[in-house]
A protein has these predicted regions:
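Transmembrane-helix boundary/entry motifs in multi-pass membrane transporters
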Residues: 2-4, 34-40, 63-92, 110-114, ...
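Extracellular loop-to-transmembrane helix junctions
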Residues: 2-7, 31-58, 214-226, 323-334
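Hydrophobic, membrane-embedded alpha-helices of multi-pass small-molecule transporters
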Residues: 4-23, 42, 89-93, 97, ...
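Transmembrane alpha-helical segments of multi-pass small-molecule transport proteins
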Residues: 6-14, 42-51, 55, 83-94, ...
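Hydrophobic alpha-helical segments and their helix-loop junctions in multi-pass secondary transporters
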Residues: 20, 94, 127, 148-174, ...
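Membrane-water interface regions at transmembrane-helix termini and the short interhelical loops
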Residues: 30-33, 60-63, 100-111, 124-145, ...
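Juxtamembrane transmembrane-helix boundary signature
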Residues: 44-71, 230-234, 238
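Extracellular/periplasmic helix-exit of transmembrane alpha-helices
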Residues: 54-58, 166, 187-188, 220-251
């Protein structure tokens, strides 16, 4: 794989997180919109933590050469803790792919009236096919889809601002797993970053310089902020859609069928990019940990895609509200451990120089 610059890193960094929950408004509303004005502060805090930890993770990859989450978080020696990290990483990646597949099922049902399992099945097959191309295929997908995602989201945000004005919903946190805007922000940043380790960390060694790392993460955070701001503006302006499985699609449908179709395409692109990244990271990790699976490169991809489809039948909104917050709190512990590892590596380097 060739060296990449700040722009491609930024697109890949943002693309990992611009999934069904994010762009549909479901995830953003549950984590931030339900806290009213404080939710805005929560979003900014989450993106700050996500960006800082992202730069740290990529630089740690450049310093150590480690790609695997367990080694990046704990170093080369950690015994049973490394197995715990690997298990949680695999679980989180699987859950993300499952949530994205469930999102497509909800999209197919809400937009086209198709049974949810039909859309999910077709989507899982397409994701599996593209994921066989590996890391290079993932970067290509993000380079093509993320700019379009950002442009369409901003257009909807500007439209909502011009038509409805600026509005922030009242504070009404409905999820007991997120008791405050601070805990919601930390949970959001933690599970997103932990899920992205296996996807983003390997790009560190392909960066042109450490300055490119900082610039790329900054670009990615800017894209995430623009999309999140646009989505929250729209849902806050029409809170009656907040209870829908896909709030932003419901908002677009309330405006016109053409806009609903346009946003449906946007959601599909978002879900596709995130699903590909999750499946690539999941299968790469499995193959690194198992010689048997590494000898059969296609089998893990196809099997994981099939299992994600089966898990998606549980339902999109329920998965977002339960899986993400719970895994976010667990991931926060590992983010702290990765920071400690980075400090140790820098200290050792300073002693040698």
């Amino acid at each position: 794989m060739k060296k990449i610059g700040s722009l491609k890193l930024g697109l890949s960094f943002a693309g990992c997180f611009l999934g069904a929950g994010y762009v549909s408004g479901q995830e953003l509303w549950q984590f931030f919109g339900s806290f009213g004005t404080l939710g805005v502060a929560g979003l900014l805090l989450a993106l700050l933590v996500l960006s800082a930890a992202g730069v740290l993770m990529l630089n740690l990859n450049r310093l150590t050469g480690y790609d695997e989450a367990d080694k990046l978080i704990l170093g080369g020696k950690a015994g049973i803790l490394r197995h715990a990290v690997t298990f949680l990483e695999l679980l989180l990646l699987f859950c993300i792919g499952t949530v994205m597949t469930a999102g497509v099922g909800a999209l197919a049902h809400q937009l086209l009236g198709l049974p949810t399992f039909v859309g999910g099945l077709l989507f899982a097959a397409a994701v599996a096919a593209v994921s066989l191309a590996g890391l290079a295929g993932m970067v290509s997908v993000f380079s093509a889809t993320v700019p379009l995602l950002c442009l369409i989201s901003l257009s909807f945000g500007v439209y909502a601002l011009c038509r409805f004005g600026f509005s922030v919903g009242s504070s009404d946190p409905g999820n007991p797993l997120m008791g405050s805007w601070v805990s919601a922000a930390l949970s959001f940043a933690s599970y997103n970053l932990f899920a992205g380790i296996a996807v983003i960390a390997p790009l560190g060694r392909h960066m042109k310089s450490s300055r490119s790392v900082f610039g790329g993460v900054l670009v990615g955070a800017g894209i995430l902020l623009c999309v999140a701001g646009s989505v929250l503006l729209c849902v806050s302006a029409a809170p009656k859609y907040a209870d829908a499985e896909l709030p932003m699609l419901a908002f677009a449908s309330g405006l016109s069928p053409i806009l609903a179709a346009l946003y449906g395409v946007l959601l599909l692109l978002a879900m596709f990019g995130t699903s590909v990244s999750a499946l690539v990271a999941l299968t790469n990790t499995l193959k690194l940990k198992s010689r048997t699976l590494s000898a059969h490169p296609k089998a893990p991809t196809l099997l994981c895609a099939a299992l994600m489809f089966c898990g998606s039948l549980y339902g999109f909104g329920d998965l977002v509200g339960f899986v993400y917050p719970l895994l976010g709190y667990l991931s926060f512990v590992f983010i702290i451990l990765m920071t400690i590892h980075y400090i140790k590596v820098k200290h050792e380097q300073n002693n040698l120089s």
